[in-house]
Design a protein with these regions (language model features):
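N-terminal hydrophobic targeting/anchoring segments and the immediately downstream early-domain regions
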Residues: 20-192, 241, 245-410
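The start of beta-strands in P-loop NTPase/AAA+ ATPase cores
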Residues: 37-39, 208-210, 231-232, 344
Length: 410
């Protein structure tokens, strides 16, 4: 009798395992079909820092880094916003000139890399560009600027960067600048939000049709931006403070205000912004050793900074327990339940710390879609999350800029 029961149990378990495998195969097949049909967009990667190396080519499948065109194709990712990241430094004329030159050089590196891989990718400057390039089968390269520091105190720089292809500026980074306060400046607030010059920057971005990015900025600066901007704004790589306490994330009130503005939060798949990190003394010791080795990352050359950043993230990824795809989709769920499906997207922060269990680079992006399908999201909802919402915001910025230009007779 026991033998018969054991046999029945084995048969039932085999059917259960087979059913699960069949279900996962169906999900994978459906995800492939969806990704071929819709426009998929990641609004933030820091890969341009790697382009400063002469040997880094977006057109080949690299062993290091998280983003290149072959892996974008593998992961079903059509479009990437390549962020020109400039760390905060001194605020004086000499530094502003140096930062301007670095920004232009990085922009040129993006152009050069896309041009030499023109059979695989093309730069996009408008929503229509993105959908046209999608139809051609090529990858799409948008440009953003992370940190308003390269603007310095010169408002004309905003248009100059727009003319060079940048379609958003993250107003600050880890420290305060002349535009606004950062959410993570150790010295606290300097402007109590957005400075008077920052208000001019936001208005100029509105005039041009350039998206204002509120990731990294302080809560007070966020509310000031919302009050100042006449166009929908974005949080290019932030998550939900209700699920993970971090000044880099948006709380529920901010999300409600973002909805009223018509904007979108692009959920950041950087582990510490999705799930509170567990205390790990070994990890902290290793990271402190790297901070000490590299003078707390201050006064470094570009090569030294890149080496320090690489060592830092290698150690962090080795010794910490990463958040999962499920954790990331929990944040998407939270936004959808609180303010609706029209205000959420994905901003990986790849090559800047982004990467979670199951999605360590762009080749694994479909795993997010798999989890969305498991939770019952429809094709149309997935289309909005993966690109429809951010393209709506960009188009609205384009439209309002055009209307402003026509009213001004220019």
């Amino acid at each position: 009798m026991k033998r018969k029961l054991s046999l029945v149990l084995i048969i039932l378990l085999s059917f259960a395992f087979s059913s699960c495998e069949d279900q996962e195969a169906r999900i994978a097949k459906k995800a492939d079909k969806i990704h071929k049909a819709i426009l998929t967009v990641d609004t933030h990667c820091d890969t341009p820092m790697r382009l400063m190396r002469s040997d880094f080519n977006l057109g080949v499948r690299n062993e290091d880094g998280c983003v290149d065109f072959p892996r974008m194709e593998e992961g079903g990712l059509d479009a990437e916003f390549f962020a020109v990241f400039i760390g905060q430094g001194p605020r004086n004329p000499e530094a502003y000139n140096e930062v301007y030159e670095r920004t232009v050089e990085t922009l040129e590196k993006i152009y050069d890399n896309v041009e030499k891989n023109s059979d695989m990718a093309e730069l996009a400057f408008t929503v229509d560009d993105a959908y046209r390039i999608k139809k051609s089968g090529k990858r799409i390269a948008f440009i953003g600027i992370e940190n308003g520091y390269p603007v310095g105190k010169d408002l004309s720089k905003v248009k100059e960067y727009y003319d060079m292809g940048a379609r958003y500026i993250t107003l600050s980074h880890s420290s305060n600048n002349d535009i606004c306060d950062s959410s993570t400046d150790e010295g606290g607030a300097e402007h109590d939000g957005l400075s008077e010059f920052g208000q001019q920057v936001v208005k100029e971005m509105n005039r041009l049709g350039m998206m204002v990015d509120v990731s990294h900025i302080s809560d007070e600066a966020f509310y000031d931006v919302i009050e100042t901007s006449t166009s929908p704004v974005i949080a290019s790589h932030s998550s939900c403070r209700a699920l993970c306490e971090s000044p880099r994330n948006l709380d529920d009130d901010m999300l409600m205000v973002l909805k009223d503005n018509g904007g979108v939060i692009q959920i950041c798949i950087l582990s510490n912004y999705l799930k509170q990190p567990e205390l790990n003394p070994v990890l902290e010791q290793k990271l402190n050793e790297i901070r000490e080795k590299y003078n707390d990352f201050e006064g470094l050359s570009e090569e030294e900074f890149e080496r320090a950043r690489r060592e830092y993230y290698e150690v962090r990824n080795k010794y910490r327990k990463l958040a999962t795809v499920e954790d990331a989709v929990d944040h998407i769920d939270h936004v959808v339940q609180l303010i609706g499906i029209d205000h959420v997207g994905i901003g990986s922060d790849f090559d800047g710390g982004g990467g979670i269990e199951g999605v360590m680079d762009v080749s694994q992006m479909k795993n997010i879609t798999h989890e969305l399908l498991r939770r019952g999201y429809t094709r149309n909802e997935i289309e909005k999350i993966w690109g429809g919402n951010i393209m709506r915001v960009l188009r609205e910025n384009e439209k309002l800029a055009q209307e402003t230009s026509e009213e001004a007779g220019t």
